[in-house]
Amino acid sequence: MRSDMIKKGFDKAPHRSLLKATGLKDEDFDKPFIAICNSFIEIIPGHKHLNEFGKLVKEAVRAAGMVPFEFNTIGVDDGIAMGHIGMRYSLPSREIIADSVETVVNAHWFDGMICIPNCDKITPGMMMAALRINIPTVFVSGGPMAAGKTSKGEVVDLSSVFEGVGAYQSGKISEEELKDIEDHGCPSCGSCSGMFTANSMNCLCEVLGLALPGNGSILAIDPRREELIKQAAEKLKILIERDIKPRDIVTEEAIDDAFALDMAMGGSTNTVLHTLALAQEAGLDYDMNRIDAVSRRVPHLCKVSPASNWHMEDIDRAGGISAILKEISRKEGVLHLDRITATGQTLRENIAHAEIKDKEVIHSLENPHSEEGGLRILKGNLAKDGAVIKSGATEVKRFEGPCVIFNSQDEALAGIMLGKVKKGDVVVIRYEGPRGGPGMPEMLAPTSAIAGMGLGADVALLTDGRFSGASRGISVGHISPEAAAGGTIALLEQGDIVCIDVEERLLEVRVSDEELDKRKKEWKRPEAKVKTGWLGRYAQMVTSANTGAVLKIPDFD
């Protein structure tokens, strides 16, 4: 066993002595040592319950004849961090999480790992670590929360609260109505109830093969999640016995399948960023062109909040992620069904008995929302390395208008609230990319303000930053190269005409190459917003969004 490095041989007597101080007995040194990588944090509702959850995982690991050791990672609640400097720490926290898991696991020579993530950057951070460490691993997330209901019976979620602010600001609802939405938008523990980033990533974890069926959709408060814990411990033991590791599971074909699910269910645009980062950790050459190819062959079958009033509980009731996978598997060439997963079985075996139980929630291949995926990759002179739009969250397929430029999210939100944006405009928020932000903050506040003011179908928004999974409307993000790297978005001027063509996958500014070259020669990179601390280091090391915004290792040659 890998853990023999710290527990076998006369020279490891000091190590065993220290381990006995934690409560171990001599007989425990013949069992696998399992890292329980938890993320219990009281300020995050999706993680509030994970302390008790972790206890159940440890019990299940002991019952399977292994020895658990629990530790916790950090985490950032994107909703609470929204709209201030906290959002600059969100994406960078992914790297800290990956590094911290790598540090603890490799320093102590664990034989296997169970990861307990739930919310936005915690899940991809742990997934990156799992691929980097490459020991047998199973993920079991904390699960989504249920949707809420106002005193009038209206179904609401966190997206409703953000949009309620814009609605109140524009006089569409009263302060009492906003308070009612606030009080009921997040009714319990669990990841926010729509197809936002956290739930999108936990669903992708399931199809990638790192988590068990049900991981993405079973609610946090559902007793079936405890059964999932027991299965996770049992499956981990099998993975250890068969020496099946994350890099055996997460192949190029598995990532294809993850994006196939993503396109079918209309997941968050952040999945593109995080899955490209996973590919980097797995040593795979996977780019946005391949994502686009998947998008072209997979139909969009689900519209979940913020694209509709359906929520994760409805997806679960309708058959869960396995039902979506089973349906798209009917189309030839969409899924790679014979690859191994964390169950010890193939994807084909995992979904064999799945079926759609509500075709209003999960559409059939014969009745898709669209013939192509719910996410699209756009390119053009405004995004030479690519950009992402959640096409399933807007009915508008082509938009052209003059740009209204803001050089930060704060500037943009203030401008929107002051009425500087009108019907037909293209809002541009730049210098908010991985390097320029720094940290590539999410633009949920501006998109929610636009939607709440009733302009969701009449105003487009472009940014080199990110969008929350709760964002909707004509929102194009991840524009690469970013403004801080001298990308075309940095060269835009007030009133330039921008064209977004979702069907043709184009993002263009109606300015000649000669004029753009002239502007580029005159452009000067703004001074870095942050020069010290973690964000200062991050800004120096981070790569572009089109490569997952991972950190680059300096060349020491």
From Swiss-Prot:
GO terms of molecular function: 2 iron, 2 sulfur cluster binding; dihydroxy-acid dehydratase activity; magnesium ion binding
Residues recorded with modification N6-carboxylysine: K121
GO biological process, alphabetically ordered: isoleucine biosynthetic process; L-valine biosynthetic process
Active-site residues from the entry: S468 (proton acceptor)
Transmembrane segments: none
Residues holding Mg(2+): D78, D120, K121, E442
Cofactor binding note: Binds 1 [2Fe-2S] cluster per subunit. This cluster acts as a Lewis acid cofactor.
Record keyword Iron present: yes
Keywords from the named record: 2Fe-2S, Amino-acid biosynthesis, Branched-chain amino acid biosynthesis, Iron, Iron-sulfur, Lyase, Magnesium, Metal-binding
Signal peptide residue numbers: none
CC cofactor: [2Fe-2S] cluster; Mg(2+)
Swiss-Prot/TrEMBL catalytic activity: (2R)-2,3-dihydroxy-3-methylbutanoate = 3-methyl-2-oxobutanoate + H2O; (2R,3R)-2,3-dihydroxy-3-methylpentanoate = (S)-3-methyl-2-oxopentanoate + H2O
InterPro entries xref list: Dihydro-acid_dehy_C, DihydroxyA_deHydtase, DiOHA_6PGluconate_deHydtase_CS, ILV_EDD_C, ILV_EDD_N, IlvD/EDD_N
Cellular component annotations (GO), alphabetically ordered: cytosol
Biological or metabolic pathway of the protein: Amino-acid biosynthesis; L-isoleucine biosynthesis; L-isoleucine from 2-oxobutanoate: step 3/4; Amino-acid biosynthesis; L-valine biosynthesis; L-valine from pyruvate: step 3/4
Pfam families: ILV_EDD_C (PF24877), ILVD_EDD_N (PF00920)
Residues annotated to bind [2Fe-2S] cluster: C119, C192
EC number, UniProt record: 4.2.1.9
EC class: lyase
Family: Belongs to the IlvD/Edd family.
Job description of the protein: Functions in the biosynthesis of branched-chain amino acids. Catalyzes the dehydration of (2R,3R)-2,3-dihydroxy-3-methylpentanoate (2,3-dihydroxy-3-methylvalerate) into 2-oxo-3-methylpentanoate (2-oxo-3-methylvalerate) and of (2R)-2,3-dihydroxy-3-methylbutanoate (2,3-dihydroxyisovalerate) into 2-oxo-3-methylbutanoate (2-oxoisovalerate), the penultimate precursor to L-isoleucine and L-valine, respectively.
Quaternary structure note: Homodimer.
Protein name in UniProt: Dihydroxy-acid dehydratase
Record organism: Bacillus cereus (strain G9842)
Gene coding for it: ilvD
